[in-house]
């Protein structure tokens, strides 16, 4: 896992159209706004989270964020535990995101 800032996250999103953007917040947080093209995968729904992660293509790039950057660290560690190596964590989380927001 590599911790990255907003600028680096945005650059990776723009340069890697195949990258998977994971929002690991709750559905209510998701409803308040999200990063474009993100998929919701609530870390607190641990069984579903793990089931989905195990189905992921291990060769893709995964960009992960939560509200403040804490849950996403745990989510990144889970991705790595199943053999995914190309994992990036948005350190400031969604609260620090300064890019486009979908609501």
Predicted segments with their positions:
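Rhodanese-like catalytic fold shared by cysteine-dependent sulfurtransferases
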Residues: 1-19, 27-61, 70-103
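Short, surface-exposed ligand- or partner-binding patches at beta-edge/loop junctions that are enriched
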Residues: 65
